[in-house]
Amino acid sequence: MDDELRERVRRAAERAALFNALKHGSDAQVGAIMGPMMGEHPDFRAHGDEIPGVIAPVIEDVNGMSDDEQRARLAELAPEDVEELDSEDEGDDHALPALPNAEAYDEVRMRCAPNPNGPWHVGHARMPSVIGTYKQRYDGSFVVRFDDTDPETKRPDLDAYDQILEDLSYLGFEADEVLTASDRVETYYEHARRLIGMGGAYTCSCPGAEFSDLKNSGEACPHRDKDPETVADEFEAMVDGEYNSGEMVLRVKTDITHKNPALRDWVAFRMVDTPHPRDAASGYRCWPMLDFQSGVDDHRTGVTHIIRGIDLQDSAKRQRFLYEYFGWEYPEVVHWGHVQLDAYDVAMSTSTIKERIAAGELEGWDDPRAPTMQSIRRRGIRGAAVVDAMVELGTSSSDVELAMSAVYANNRDLVDDTAPRQFLVRDGFEARGEGPEESHEAVEVPVDDGPDEATPQVHPEHPDRGDREIPVGERVLVEATDLPAAGDRVWLKGYGPVRYDGERFAFLDADIDIVREEGVDVVQWVPAEHNVDVRLRTMDGDVTGYAEPGFADRDADEIVQFVRVGFARVDAHRDGGASVAYFTHP
Protein backbone atom coordinates (compact mmCIF):
# COMPACT_ATOMS: atom_id res chain seq x y z
CA MET A 1 0.00 0.00 0.00
CA ASP A 2 1.60 3.28 -1.08
CA ASP A 3 1.45 6.50 0.95
CA GLU A 4 -1.29 8.06 -1.17
CA LEU A 5 -3.58 5.05 -0.80
CA ARG A 6 -2.78 4.81 2.91
CA GLU A 7 -3.92 8.41 3.38
CA ARG A 8 -7.14 7.74 1.43
CA VAL A 9 -7.82 4.72 3.64
CA ARG A 10 -7.25 6.76 6.80
CA ARG A 11 -9.54 9.55 5.59
CA ALA A 12 -12.30 7.10 4.61
CA ALA A 13 -11.94 5.31 7.94
CA GLU A 14 -12.13 8.56 9.87
CA ARG A 15 -15.32 9.56 8.09
CA ALA A 16 -16.88 6.10 8.55
CA ALA A 17 -15.86 5.92 12.21
CA LEU A 18 -17.23 9.38 12.95
CA PHE A 19 -20.54 8.53 11.28
CA ASN A 20 -20.73 5.15 13.02
CA ALA A 21 -19.92 6.55 16.47
CA LEU A 22 -22.46 9.36 16.18
CA LYS A 23 -25.15 7.12 14.70
CA HIS A 24 -24.92 4.49 17.43
CA GLY A 25 -23.80 6.64 20.34
CA SER A 26 -20.92 4.31 21.14
CA ASP A 27 -17.34 3.61 20.17
CA ALA A 28 -16.76 2.68 16.54
CA GLN A 29 -15.34 -0.80 15.91
CA VAL A 30 -13.03 -1.93 13.13
CA GLY A 31 -15.39 -4.71 12.07
CA ALA A 32 -18.42 -2.41 11.91
CA ILE A 33 -16.87 -0.01 9.41
CA MET A 34 -14.82 -2.41 7.27
CA GLY A 35 -17.76 -3.72 5.23
CA PRO A 36 -19.33 -0.36 4.31
CA MET A 37 -15.91 1.15 3.64
CA MET A 38 -14.92 -1.67 1.28
CA GLY A 39 -18.26 -1.39 -0.49
CA GLU A 40 -17.81 2.34 -1.07
CA HIS A 41 -14.15 2.00 -2.10
CA PRO A 42 -13.70 -1.21 -4.15
CA ASP A 43 -10.03 -0.42 -4.79
CA PHE A 44 -9.35 -0.92 -1.07
CA ARG A 45 -10.26 -4.62 -1.23
CA ALA A 46 -6.92 -5.75 -2.63
CA HIS A 47 -5.35 -4.46 0.58
CA GLY A 48 -7.92 -5.96 2.96
CA ASP A 49 -5.32 -7.69 5.10
CA GLU A 50 -3.40 -4.45 5.70
CA ILE A 51 -6.32 -2.14 6.31
CA PRO A 52 -7.22 -3.15 9.91
CA GLY A 53 -3.75 -2.14 11.05
CA VAL A 54 -3.95 1.18 9.19
CA ILE A 55 -7.38 2.20 10.45
CA ALA A 56 -7.19 0.97 14.07
CA PRO A 57 -5.29 4.09 15.30
CA VAL A 58 -7.69 6.34 13.38
CA ILE A 59 -10.69 4.70 15.05
CA GLU A 60 -9.02 4.97 18.44
CA ASP A 61 -8.56 8.72 17.90
CA VAL A 62 -12.21 9.10 16.89
CA ASN A 63 -13.37 7.16 19.95
CA GLY A 64 -11.35 9.53 22.13
CA MET A 65 -13.33 12.56 20.94
CA SER A 66 -16.41 13.99 22.62
CA ASP A 67 -19.72 13.89 20.72
CA ASP A 68 -19.39 17.58 19.88
CA GLU A 69 -15.86 17.10 18.58
CA GLN A 70 -16.95 14.14 16.46
CA ARG A 71 -19.84 16.11 15.00
CA ALA A 72 -17.66 19.13 14.21
CA ARG A 73 -15.03 16.98 12.54
CA LEU A 74 -17.61 15.08 10.48
CA ALA A 75 -19.10 18.40 9.36
CA GLU A 76 -15.65 19.32 8.00
CA LEU A 77 -15.15 16.03 6.18
CA ALA A 78 -18.67 15.24 4.97
CA PRO A 79 -21.45 17.70 5.85
CA GLU A 80 -23.94 15.50 3.97
CA ASP A 81 -23.35 12.76 6.57
CA VAL A 82 -24.33 15.15 9.35
CA GLU A 83 -27.51 15.97 7.44
CA GLU A 84 -28.28 12.26 7.14
CA LEU A 85 -27.82 11.80 10.87
CA ASP A 86 -30.10 14.74 11.58
CA SER A 87 -32.81 13.31 9.34
CA GLU A 88 -32.87 9.92 11.06
CA ASP A 89 -35.23 9.15 13.89
CA GLU A 90 -33.63 9.92 17.21
CA GLY A 91 -32.55 6.80 19.04
CA ASP A 92 -32.74 4.49 16.00
CA ASP A 93 -29.48 2.61 16.40
CA HIS A 94 -30.33 -0.50 14.38
CA ALA A 95 -28.13 -1.58 11.48
CA LEU A 96 -31.20 -2.90 9.66
CA PRO A 97 -34.14 -0.74 8.57
CA ALA A 98 -37.45 -1.18 10.34
CA LEU A 99 -39.70 -3.87 8.87
CA PRO A 100 -42.69 -2.47 6.98
CA ASN A 101 -45.88 -2.25 9.05
CA ALA A 102 -44.39 -4.33 11.87
CA GLU A 103 -46.58 -2.52 14.36
CA ALA A 104 -49.71 -3.86 12.63
CA TYR A 105 -49.01 -7.45 13.70
CA ASP A 106 -49.34 -9.08 17.11
CA GLU A 107 -46.13 -10.96 16.37
CA VAL A 108 -43.51 -10.59 13.65
CA ARG A 109 -43.04 -14.04 12.15
CA MET A 110 -40.41 -14.64 9.48
CA ARG A 111 -39.14 -17.69 7.67
CA CYS A 112 -35.89 -18.93 6.24
CA ALA A 113 -36.74 -21.40 3.48
CA PRO A 114 -33.62 -23.21 2.27
CA ASN A 115 -33.59 -25.78 -0.49
CA PRO A 116 -31.65 -28.68 1.06
CA ASN A 117 -29.94 -29.66 -2.19
CA GLY A 118 -26.55 -29.38 -0.50
CA PRO A 119 -24.67 -27.80 2.38
CA TRP A 120 -24.73 -24.02 2.66
CA HIS A 121 -22.23 -21.71 1.02
CA VAL A 122 -21.31 -18.47 2.77
CA GLY A 123 -23.95 -16.45 0.93
CA HIS A 124 -26.69 -18.59 2.44
CA ALA A 125 -25.80 -17.13 5.85
CA ARG A 126 -27.27 -13.76 4.91
CA MET A 127 -30.93 -14.76 5.29
CA PRO A 128 -30.73 -16.35 8.77
CA SER A 129 -28.39 -13.59 9.94
CA VAL A 130 -30.91 -10.90 9.04
CA ILE A 131 -34.02 -12.83 10.08
CA GLY A 132 -32.42 -13.82 13.38
CA THR A 133 -31.51 -10.21 14.03
CA TYR A 134 -35.05 -9.06 13.27
CA LYS A 135 -36.42 -11.77 15.56
CA GLN A 136 -34.34 -10.39 18.42
CA ARG A 137 -35.33 -6.82 17.60
CA TYR A 138 -39.08 -7.49 17.49
CA ASP A 139 -39.20 -10.44 19.90
CA GLY A 140 -40.70 -12.40 17.04
CA SER A 141 -40.59 -15.96 15.69
CA PHE A 142 -38.13 -17.61 13.33
CA VAL A 143 -39.44 -20.45 11.14
CA VAL A 144 -37.14 -22.73 9.15
CA ARG A 145 -38.93 -24.43 6.27
CA PHE A 146 -37.13 -26.84 3.98
CA ASP A 147 -38.51 -26.18 0.49
CA ASP A 148 -37.71 -29.63 -0.88
CA THR A 149 -40.51 -30.20 -3.40
CA ASP A 150 -38.25 -30.53 -6.45
CA PRO A 151 -36.88 -34.08 -6.33
CA GLU A 152 -35.33 -33.85 -9.78
CA THR A 153 -33.82 -30.49 -10.77
CA LYS A 154 -32.71 -29.47 -7.27
CA ARG A 155 -32.64 -32.90 -5.75
CA PRO A 156 -32.47 -32.81 -1.94
CA ASP A 157 -29.34 -34.05 -0.21
CA LEU A 158 -30.38 -36.14 2.78
CA ASP A 159 -27.43 -34.95 4.84
CA ALA A 160 -28.13 -31.28 4.14
CA TYR A 161 -31.20 -31.02 6.39
CA ASP A 162 -29.20 -31.53 9.59
CA GLN A 163 -26.17 -29.69 8.22
CA ILE A 164 -28.24 -26.57 7.61
CA LEU A 165 -29.64 -26.65 11.14
CA GLU A 166 -26.08 -27.03 12.45
CA ASP A 167 -25.04 -23.98 10.42
CA LEU A 168 -27.97 -22.06 11.87
CA SER A 169 -26.81 -22.94 15.38
CA TYR A 170 -23.25 -21.95 14.47
CA LEU A 171 -24.56 -18.50 13.52
CA GLY A 172 -26.13 -18.24 16.96
CA PHE A 173 -29.80 -18.84 16.13
CA GLU A 174 -32.32 -21.56 16.87
CA ALA A 175 -35.55 -21.98 14.94
CA ASP A 176 -38.84 -21.66 16.80
CA GLU A 177 -40.36 -24.11 14.33
CA VAL A 178 -38.85 -26.43 11.69
CA LEU A 179 -41.01 -27.63 8.80
CA THR A 180 -40.30 -29.86 5.81
CA ALA A 181 -42.38 -29.17 2.71
CA SER A 182 -42.21 -32.77 1.46
CA ASP A 183 -44.07 -33.77 4.65
CA ARG A 184 -46.91 -31.44 3.70
CA VAL A 185 -47.81 -32.59 0.18
CA GLU A 186 -51.33 -33.59 1.22
CA THR A 187 -51.89 -30.02 2.45
CA TYR A 188 -50.96 -28.69 -0.99
CA TYR A 189 -53.32 -31.19 -2.62
CA GLU A 190 -56.16 -30.00 -0.37
CA HIS A 191 -55.62 -26.40 -1.42
CA ALA A 192 -55.39 -27.38 -5.08
CA ARG A 193 -58.77 -29.12 -4.78
CA ARG A 194 -60.27 -26.01 -3.18
CA LEU A 195 -58.86 -23.86 -5.97
CA ILE A 196 -60.25 -26.19 -8.63
CA GLY A 197 -63.67 -26.04 -6.97
CA MET A 198 -63.56 -22.24 -7.26
CA GLY A 199 -62.79 -22.47 -10.96
CA GLY A 200 -59.37 -21.02 -10.25
CA ALA A 201 -57.25 -23.78 -11.78
CA TYR A 202 -57.29 -26.13 -14.76
CA THR A 203 -55.39 -29.17 -15.94
CA CYS A 204 -53.39 -28.68 -19.12
CA SER A 205 -51.64 -31.18 -21.38
CA CYS A 206 -50.27 -28.66 -23.88
CA PRO A 207 -46.61 -29.24 -24.77
CA GLY A 208 -44.50 -26.60 -23.07
CA ALA A 209 -43.40 -24.83 -26.24
CA GLU A 210 -46.96 -24.75 -27.58
CA PHE A 211 -48.37 -23.22 -24.40
CA SER A 212 -45.52 -20.71 -24.29
CA ASP A 213 -46.42 -19.49 -27.78
CA LEU A 214 -50.07 -19.11 -26.81
CA LYS A 215 -49.22 -17.39 -23.54
CA ASN A 216 -46.85 -14.92 -25.16
CA SER A 217 -49.52 -13.97 -27.66
CA GLY A 218 -52.14 -13.59 -24.92
CA GLU A 219 -54.27 -16.49 -26.15
CA ALA A 220 -55.94 -19.09 -23.94
CA CYS A 221 -55.10 -22.73 -24.48
CA PRO A 222 -58.01 -25.10 -25.33
CA HIS A 223 -57.99 -26.59 -21.82
CA ARG A 224 -58.66 -23.33 -20.00
CA ASP A 225 -62.44 -23.63 -20.11
CA LYS A 226 -62.74 -27.20 -18.89
CA ASP A 227 -65.53 -27.75 -16.38
CA PRO A 228 -64.34 -28.07 -12.75
CA GLU A 229 -65.47 -31.71 -12.56
CA THR A 230 -63.18 -32.74 -15.41
CA VAL A 231 -60.34 -30.72 -13.93
CA ALA A 232 -60.90 -32.39 -10.55
CA ASP A 233 -60.86 -35.88 -12.09
CA GLU A 234 -57.69 -35.19 -14.04
CA PHE A 235 -56.00 -33.69 -11.01
CA GLU A 236 -56.80 -36.84 -8.99
CA ALA A 237 -55.25 -38.85 -11.82
CA MET A 238 -52.14 -36.68 -11.41
CA VAL A 239 -52.13 -37.37 -7.68
CA ASP A 240 -52.48 -41.10 -8.37
CA GLY A 241 -49.45 -40.98 -10.67
CA GLU A 242 -51.34 -41.89 -13.85
CA TYR A 243 -49.38 -39.41 -15.99
CA ASN A 244 -45.72 -39.35 -16.85
CA SER A 245 -43.46 -36.36 -16.44
CA GLY A 246 -44.44 -33.60 -18.85
CA GLU A 247 -47.83 -35.04 -19.77
CA MET A 248 -50.06 -32.98 -17.48
CA VAL A 249 -49.84 -29.88 -15.28
CA LEU A 250 -52.27 -27.92 -13.13
CA ARG A 251 -52.32 -24.21 -13.88
CA VAL A 252 -53.61 -21.31 -11.78
CA LYS A 253 -56.09 -19.31 -13.83
CA THR A 254 -54.88 -15.68 -13.74
CA ASP A 255 -55.14 -13.13 -16.57
CA ILE A 256 -54.06 -14.58 -19.90
CA THR A 257 -53.65 -11.06 -21.28
CA HIS A 258 -51.67 -9.70 -18.33
CA LYS A 259 -48.97 -7.26 -19.43
CA ASN A 260 -46.37 -9.49 -17.76
CA PRO A 261 -46.36 -12.89 -19.54
CA ALA A 262 -44.65 -14.50 -16.54
CA LEU A 263 -47.89 -14.06 -14.56
CA ARG A 264 -50.18 -15.65 -17.14
CA ASP A 265 -51.71 -18.95 -15.99
CA TRP A 266 -48.65 -20.21 -14.15
CA VAL A 267 -48.01 -23.86 -13.30
CA ALA A 268 -49.00 -24.94 -9.79
CA PHE A 269 -48.37 -28.72 -10.03
CA ARG A 270 -46.41 -30.95 -12.39
CA MET A 271 -45.52 -34.62 -12.72
CA VAL A 272 -42.04 -35.78 -11.71
CA ASP A 273 -40.96 -39.36 -12.41
CA THR A 274 -37.86 -39.21 -10.17
CA PRO A 275 -38.69 -40.44 -6.64
CA HIS A 276 -37.95 -38.14 -3.73
CA PRO A 277 -34.88 -39.30 -1.74
CA ARG A 278 -36.79 -39.13 1.57
CA ASP A 279 -38.64 -42.38 2.21
CA ALA A 280 -41.64 -40.49 3.60
CA ALA A 281 -42.06 -38.63 0.31
CA SER A 282 -40.81 -41.17 -2.22
CA GLY A 283 -44.30 -42.27 -3.26
CA TYR A 284 -45.41 -38.90 -4.61
CA ARG A 285 -45.26 -38.12 -8.34
CA CYS A 286 -47.43 -35.00 -8.44
CA TRP A 287 -45.40 -32.15 -6.95
CA PRO A 288 -46.27 -28.49 -6.32
CA MET A 289 -44.19 -25.76 -7.88
CA LEU A 290 -42.39 -23.53 -5.42
CA ASP A 291 -44.70 -20.53 -5.88
CA PHE A 292 -47.75 -22.62 -4.94
CA GLN A 293 -46.09 -24.54 -2.10
CA SER A 294 -44.42 -21.48 -0.62
CA GLY A 295 -47.54 -19.36 -0.94
CA VAL A 296 -49.68 -21.89 0.91
CA ASP A 297 -47.09 -22.47 3.60
CA ASP A 298 -46.47 -18.79 4.26
CA HIS A 299 -50.17 -18.34 5.00
CA ARG A 300 -50.65 -21.57 6.93
CA THR A 301 -47.65 -20.87 9.19
CA GLY A 302 -48.57 -17.24 9.87
CA VAL A 303 -45.59 -15.60 8.17
CA THR A 304 -45.93 -11.81 8.38
CA HIS A 305 -42.77 -10.68 6.57
CA ILE A 306 -40.87 -12.25 3.68
CA ILE A 307 -37.37 -11.37 2.53
CA ARG A 308 -36.49 -12.61 -0.93
CA GLY A 309 -34.23 -11.75 -3.86
CA ILE A 310 -35.01 -8.88 -6.18
CA ASP A 311 -35.12 -11.43 -9.02
CA LEU A 312 -38.15 -13.08 -7.37
CA GLN A 313 -40.51 -10.12 -7.60
CA ASP A 314 -42.68 -12.09 -10.01
CA SER A 315 -43.14 -14.78 -7.36
CA ALA A 316 -44.95 -12.33 -5.11
CA LYS A 317 -47.12 -11.22 -8.03
CA ARG A 318 -48.00 -14.80 -8.96
CA GLN A 319 -48.82 -15.70 -5.38
CA ARG A 320 -51.12 -12.71 -5.00
CA PHE A 321 -53.50 -14.34 -7.51
CA LEU A 322 -53.58 -17.38 -5.24
CA TYR A 323 -54.17 -15.26 -2.14
CA GLU A 324 -57.03 -13.42 -3.84
CA TYR A 325 -58.76 -16.71 -4.62
CA PHE A 326 -58.50 -17.85 -1.01
CA GLY A 327 -59.24 -14.45 0.51
CA TRP A 328 -55.91 -14.30 2.32
CA GLU A 329 -53.86 -11.23 3.21
CA TYR A 330 -50.44 -11.28 1.58
CA PRO A 331 -47.41 -10.86 3.88
CA GLU A 332 -45.17 -7.82 3.79
CA VAL A 333 -42.28 -8.32 1.35
CA VAL A 334 -38.74 -6.93 1.28
CA HIS A 335 -36.80 -7.59 -1.93
CA TRP A 336 -33.03 -7.38 -1.70
CA GLY A 337 -30.15 -7.60 -4.15
CA HIS A 338 -27.75 -10.47 -4.53
CA VAL A 339 -24.67 -10.80 -2.36
CA GLN A 340 -21.28 -11.48 -3.92
CA LEU A 341 -18.19 -12.64 -2.08
CA ASP A 342 -14.59 -11.61 -2.61
CA ALA A 343 -11.40 -13.55 -1.74
CA TYR A 344 -12.43 -16.86 -3.36
CA ASP A 345 -11.64 -18.37 -6.76
CA VAL A 346 -14.49 -20.89 -6.46
CA ALA A 347 -17.96 -19.64 -7.41
CA MET A 348 -20.45 -19.33 -4.56
CA SER A 349 -22.81 -21.91 -6.06
CA THR A 350 -23.96 -25.19 -4.55
CA SER A 351 -23.97 -26.98 -7.91
CA THR A 352 -20.53 -25.64 -8.86
CA ILE A 353 -19.01 -26.67 -5.54
CA LYS A 354 -20.54 -30.15 -5.92
CA GLU A 355 -19.00 -30.45 -9.38
CA ARG A 356 -15.58 -29.33 -8.14
CA ILE A 357 -15.70 -31.89 -5.32
CA ALA A 358 -16.80 -34.67 -7.68
CA ALA A 359 -13.95 -33.79 -10.04
CA GLY A 360 -11.42 -33.96 -7.21
CA GLU A 361 -10.64 -30.25 -7.49
CA LEU A 362 -11.86 -29.69 -3.92
CA GLU A 363 -11.35 -32.15 -1.09
CA GLY A 364 -14.82 -31.63 0.36
CA TRP A 365 -17.24 -29.03 1.65
CA ASP A 366 -14.76 -28.02 4.36
CA ASP A 367 -11.83 -27.50 1.97
CA PRO A 368 -10.25 -24.12 2.89
CA ARG A 369 -10.65 -23.02 -0.74
CA ALA A 370 -14.42 -23.58 -0.73
CA PRO A 371 -16.69 -20.59 0.08
CA THR A 372 -18.83 -22.72 2.38
CA MET A 373 -20.07 -22.56 5.93
CA GLN A 374 -18.32 -25.83 6.76
CA SER A 375 -15.04 -24.39 5.49
CA ILE A 376 -15.12 -21.18 7.50
CA ARG A 377 -16.21 -23.08 10.61
CA ARG A 378 -13.25 -25.42 10.27
CA ARG A 379 -10.97 -22.43 9.82
CA GLY A 380 -12.09 -21.09 13.19
CA ILE A 381 -14.25 -18.15 12.13
CA ARG A 382 -16.96 -17.47 14.70
CA GLY A 383 -20.56 -17.38 13.55
CA ALA A 384 -21.09 -13.97 15.16
CA ALA A 385 -18.39 -12.50 12.91
CA VAL A 386 -20.35 -13.64 9.86
CA VAL A 387 -23.69 -12.42 11.24
CA ASP A 388 -22.38 -8.93 11.99
CA ALA A 389 -20.87 -8.60 8.52
CA MET A 390 -24.07 -9.81 6.85
CA VAL A 391 -26.27 -7.48 8.89
CA GLU A 392 -24.07 -4.52 7.96
CA LEU A 393 -24.92 -5.19 4.30
CA GLY A 394 -28.52 -4.22 5.07
CA THR A 395 -31.50 -5.08 2.88
CA SER A 396 -30.92 -2.81 -0.10
CA SER A 397 -32.40 -3.84 -3.44
CA SER A 398 -28.97 -3.22 -4.98
CA ASP A 399 -26.44 -6.02 -5.27
CA VAL A 400 -23.83 -5.95 -2.50
CA GLU A 401 -20.43 -7.52 -1.96
CA LEU A 402 -19.32 -9.09 1.27
CA ALA A 403 -15.66 -8.32 1.91
CA MET A 404 -14.13 -11.24 3.77
CA SER A 405 -11.75 -8.74 5.34
CA ALA A 406 -14.80 -7.39 7.22
CA VAL A 407 -15.56 -10.90 8.51
CA TYR A 408 -11.92 -11.29 9.50
CA ALA A 409 -11.92 -7.96 11.34
CA ASN A 410 -15.06 -8.97 13.25
CA ASN A 411 -13.55 -12.33 14.10
CA ARG A 412 -10.28 -10.77 15.21
CA ASP A 413 -12.25 -8.70 17.72
CA LEU A 414 -13.84 -11.92 19.02
CA VAL A 415 -10.78 -14.17 19.30
CA ASP A 416 -7.77 -11.92 19.83
CA ASP A 417 -8.30 -11.49 23.56
CA THR A 418 -8.44 -15.23 24.26
CA ALA A 419 -6.04 -16.66 21.67
CA PRO A 420 -2.74 -17.81 23.24
CA ARG A 421 0.37 -16.86 21.30
CA GLN A 422 2.53 -19.54 19.71
CA PHE A 423 5.66 -19.53 17.57
CA LEU A 424 5.62 -21.16 14.13
CA VAL A 425 8.58 -21.32 11.76
CA ARG A 426 7.44 -22.11 8.22
CA ASP A 427 9.50 -24.54 6.15
CA GLY A 428 7.62 -25.42 3.00
CA PHE A 429 4.50 -24.88 0.91
CA GLU A 430 2.38 -27.28 -1.10
CA ALA A 431 0.11 -25.45 -3.52
CA ARG A 432 -3.36 -26.80 -4.28
CA GLY A 433 -4.95 -26.22 -7.64
CA GLU A 434 -3.95 -22.95 -9.25
CA GLY A 435 -3.25 -21.05 -6.03
CA PRO A 436 -0.29 -18.68 -5.83
CA GLU A 437 3.10 -20.14 -5.05
CA GLU A 438 4.73 -19.31 -1.73
CA SER A 439 8.27 -19.95 -0.59
CA HIS A 440 9.15 -20.81 3.01
CA GLU A 441 12.40 -22.21 4.33
CA ALA A 442 13.56 -22.83 7.87
CA VAL A 443 17.23 -22.31 8.70
CA GLU A 444 19.00 -23.97 11.64
CA VAL A 445 21.36 -21.64 13.53
CA PRO A 446 23.53 -22.44 16.60
CA VAL A 447 23.06 -20.14 19.61
CA ASP A 448 25.94 -19.25 21.95
CA ASP A 449 26.03 -17.83 25.47
CA GLY A 450 22.29 -17.40 26.04
CA PRO A 451 19.79 -18.63 28.64
CA ASP A 452 18.71 -22.27 28.52
CA GLU A 453 15.04 -21.32 28.42
CA ALA A 454 12.88 -18.63 26.90
CA THR A 455 9.75 -17.38 28.66
CA PRO A 456 7.53 -15.43 26.24
CA GLN A 457 4.12 -14.41 27.56
CA VAL A 458 1.06 -16.50 26.82
CA HIS A 459 -0.70 -13.25 25.81
CA PRO A 460 1.01 -9.85 25.63
CA GLU A 461 -2.12 -8.02 26.86
CA HIS A 462 -2.64 -10.35 29.81
CA PRO A 463 0.55 -10.85 31.85
CA ASP A 464 -1.56 -12.57 34.51
CA ARG A 465 -1.93 -15.57 32.21
CA GLY A 466 1.72 -16.37 32.72
CA ASP A 467 4.60 -17.33 30.46
CA ARG A 468 5.36 -20.18 28.09
CA GLU A 469 8.49 -22.15 28.89
CA ILE A 470 10.49 -22.99 25.76
CA PRO A 471 13.78 -24.89 26.08
CA VAL A 472 16.33 -23.34 23.72
CA GLY A 473 18.96 -26.03 23.33
CA GLU A 474 22.04 -25.51 21.21
CA ARG A 475 20.31 -24.54 17.96
CA VAL A 476 17.15 -22.71 16.88
CA LEU A 477 15.13 -22.59 13.68
CA VAL A 478 14.20 -19.28 12.06
CA GLU A 479 12.69 -18.48 8.70
CA ALA A 480 15.30 -17.78 6.03
CA THR A 481 13.72 -14.40 5.26
CA ASP A 482 14.23 -13.38 8.91
CA LEU A 483 17.93 -14.22 8.95
CA PRO A 484 19.89 -10.94 9.23
CA ALA A 485 23.02 -10.01 7.35
CA ALA A 486 26.30 -11.02 8.96
CA GLY A 487 27.09 -8.61 11.78
CA ASP A 488 23.47 -7.50 12.26
CA ARG A 489 21.22 -8.16 15.23
CA VAL A 490 17.71 -9.55 15.63
CA TRP A 491 15.54 -10.04 18.69
CA LEU A 492 14.44 -13.64 19.14
CA LYS A 493 11.01 -12.95 20.57
CA GLY A 494 10.70 -13.99 24.21
CA TYR A 495 14.41 -14.83 24.38
CA GLY A 496 16.49 -11.74 23.69
CA PRO A 497 18.79 -9.98 21.20
CA VAL A 498 21.43 -11.91 19.29
CA ARG A 499 24.07 -10.97 16.76
CA TYR A 500 24.53 -13.09 13.65
CA ASP A 501 28.09 -13.64 12.43
CA GLY A 502 27.09 -15.42 9.25
CA GLU A 503 26.94 -18.85 10.89
CA ARG A 504 25.89 -18.50 14.54
CA PHE A 505 23.81 -16.35 16.88
CA ALA A 506 25.64 -14.84 19.85
CA PHE A 507 23.39 -13.77 22.73
CA LEU A 508 23.90 -10.12 23.74
CA ASP A 509 21.64 -9.15 26.66
CA ALA A 510 17.97 -8.83 27.51
CA ASP A 511 17.57 -5.07 27.16
CA ILE A 512 14.30 -4.45 25.30
CA ASP A 513 15.44 -0.88 24.64
CA ILE A 514 17.54 -2.26 21.80
CA VAL A 515 14.31 -2.98 19.97
CA ARG A 516 12.53 0.21 20.98
CA GLU A 517 15.38 2.64 20.33
CA GLU A 518 17.44 1.03 17.61
CA GLY A 519 14.84 -0.66 15.41
CA VAL A 520 16.10 -4.22 15.75
CA ASP A 521 13.75 -6.67 13.99
CA VAL A 522 11.77 -9.06 16.19
CA VAL A 523 11.40 -12.58 14.79
CA GLN A 524 9.74 -15.81 15.88
CA TRP A 525 11.78 -18.98 16.31
CA VAL A 526 11.55 -22.51 17.69
CA PRO A 527 14.16 -24.82 19.20
CA ALA A 528 15.70 -27.11 16.61
CA GLU A 529 15.59 -30.17 18.87
CA HIS A 530 12.25 -29.73 20.63
CA ASN A 531 9.41 -28.68 18.32
CA VAL A 532 6.18 -29.91 16.78
CA ASP A 533 5.74 -30.67 13.09
CA VAL A 534 2.76 -28.67 11.82
CA ARG A 535 0.76 -28.66 8.62
CA LEU A 536 -1.09 -25.35 8.34
CA ARG A 537 -3.94 -25.57 5.83
CA THR A 538 -4.65 -22.29 4.02
CA MET A 539 -6.84 -21.13 1.15
CA ASP A 540 -3.82 -21.24 -1.18
CA GLY A 541 -2.15 -24.45 -0.05
CA ASP A 542 -0.59 -26.28 2.86
CA VAL A 543 2.22 -24.62 4.78
CA THR A 544 4.56 -27.00 6.58
CA GLY A 545 6.66 -25.94 9.51
CA TYR A 546 7.58 -26.30 13.16
CA ALA A 547 5.78 -24.97 16.22
CA GLU A 548 7.09 -24.49 19.72
CA PRO A 549 6.79 -27.64 21.88
CA GLY A 550 3.79 -26.37 23.85
CA PHE A 551 1.65 -26.48 20.71
CA ALA A 552 1.25 -30.22 21.24
CA ASP A 553 -0.77 -29.45 24.38
CA ARG A 554 -3.27 -27.19 22.63
CA ASP A 555 -6.77 -28.66 22.40
CA ALA A 556 -8.54 -29.37 19.13
CA ASP A 557 -10.84 -26.47 18.16
CA GLU A 558 -8.73 -23.99 20.14
CA ILE A 559 -7.82 -20.75 18.37
CA VAL A 560 -4.19 -19.68 18.65
CA GLN A 561 -2.23 -16.85 17.13
CA PHE A 562 0.96 -17.87 15.39
CA VAL A 563 3.07 -14.76 15.98
CA ARG A 564 3.68 -12.78 12.78
CA VAL A 565 1.74 -15.40 10.78
CA GLY A 566 -1.89 -15.15 11.87
CA PHE A 567 -4.70 -16.85 13.75
CA ALA A 568 -5.32 -20.56 13.32
CA ARG A 569 -7.66 -23.24 14.60
CA VAL A 570 -6.06 -26.38 16.03
CA ASP A 571 -7.57 -29.27 14.09
CA ALA A 572 -5.81 -32.44 15.24
CA HIS A 573 -2.64 -33.85 16.77
CA ARG A 574 -1.60 -37.07 15.06
CA ASP A 575 0.62 -39.76 16.52
CA GLY A 576 3.65 -40.16 14.30
CA GLY A 577 2.57 -37.35 11.98
CA ALA A 578 2.28 -33.61 11.81
CA SER A 579 -0.24 -31.71 13.88
CA VAL A 580 -2.83 -30.03 11.67
CA ALA A 581 -4.11 -26.48 11.99
CA TYR A 582 -6.34 -24.40 9.73
CA PHE A 583 -5.37 -20.82 8.95
CA THR A 584 -8.14 -18.49 10.09
CA HIS A 585 -6.93 -15.08 8.92
CA PRO A 586 -4.09 -12.63 9.56
UniProtKB/Swiss-Prot annotation:
Can you state which reaction this protein catalyses? tRNA(Glu) + L-glutamate + ATP = L-glutamyl-tRNA(Glu) + AMP + diphosphate
Q: Where, by residue number, is the motif 'HIGH' region?
A: 114-124
List locations, semicolon-separated. Cytoplasm
Tell me the organism: Halobacterium salinarum (strain ATCC 29341 / DSM 671 / R1)
Q: Which keywords does this Swiss-Prot/TrEMBL entry list?
A: Aminoacyl-tRNA synthetase, ATP-binding, Cytoplasm, Ligase, Nucleotide-binding, Protein biosynthesis
Which GO terms are recorded in the biological process aspect for this UniProt protein?
amide biosynthetic process; glutamyl-tRNA aminoacylation
- Cellular component terms, GO, for this chain's entry? cytosol
Q: Where is the composition biased (Basic and acidic residues)?
A: 431-443, 459-468
Q: Which Gene3D superfamilies match?
A: 2.40.240.100, HUPs, Ribosomal Protein L25, Chain P
Listed GO MF terms: ATP binding; glutamate-tRNA ligase activity
Name of the protein: Glutamate--tRNA ligase
- According to its UniProt record, the EC number is 6.1.1.17
Q: Which family does it belong to?
A: Belongs to the class-I aminoacyl-tRNA synthetase family. Glutamate--tRNA ligase type 2 subfamily.
